[in-house]
Amino acid sequence: FLHISGIDAAGANAAALEAVCVEQRRNFAEIQRYDRALLRSTTDADSYWDTHVRAKKRKEIRRLQKRLADLGAIKSRIMSEASDLPDWATDFLALEASGWKGIAGTALQCRAADTAFFMEALSAAQENGRLHFLRIDLDGKAIAMLVNFRHLDGAFSLKIAFDETLGRFSPGVLIEIDNLHAVLGDPSVTWMDSCAAADHPMIDSIWAERRSIAQFRIALKGSGLIRTRRAAAFAIAGAAERAAAYVKGR
């Protein structure tokens, strides 16, 4: 059988997969589902912030913004000129590598192939009008950066990086707040998918909406004994996955 993951459970792809499986008489089952943060609202950013974020958290954010501003000149920007891309991309790579990912060797800058892929992806997105790139600077130096990719009337969040030495000011949260204002202030963007893990404590506390992401198991074709064996394997796999989910949830 075939596993397909990362599918919007309520989207056209999931519906098409199920329709094809029904038509071809294939066994088809949803085996896993989780919800992740989604930003989708017709309200303005200030109203959304006041409605969906707890008063205590809003107060704490204002305090952090004030404390950070005491350190120097704070400037939030969205990249608008293609000529800025090389410098912005280089700044992002350096910022990510300056933290734990650099120490662990998992930052994009740690491998030449990953760096090249990232640069090519940003360049292609920029050329096609799909790049949404934000940053916060302290005295001209990037302390938080966020890369999003736009698609039709929506967008997907790709990567975030921030200065971990300034972690006490939550720069990652602050740039997500800038992002919230940018998205809800742009009539051409009706939604943004966080692409975050389930129950992510930071983004879940800011974005109120959720998108359900599913994994499906699809039986492969066969006949006679092969088909019987595959049907049995399909049933056994389903039972095992349900048992694993039960144990994990205890």
Language-model segments: residues:
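A generic secondary-structure signal for well-formed alpha-helical elements
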Residues: 68, 72, 96-104, 183, ...
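Conserved acetyl-CoA-binding loop-helix of GNAT-fold acetyltransferases
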Residues: 168-181
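Alpha-helix boundary/interfacial micro-motifs
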Residues: 113, 156-157, 170, 189, ...
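Short, high-confidence coil segments that cap the C-terminus of an alpha-helix
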Residues: 1, 131, 186-189
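Short glycine/serine- and small hydrophobic-enriched flexible loop segments
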Residues: 120-123, 178-185
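A conserved beta-strand-loop-helix scaffold within acyl/acetyltransferase catalytic domains
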Residues: 3-168
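Active-site/acyl-donor-binding loops of N-acyltransferases
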Residues: 19-46, 184-250
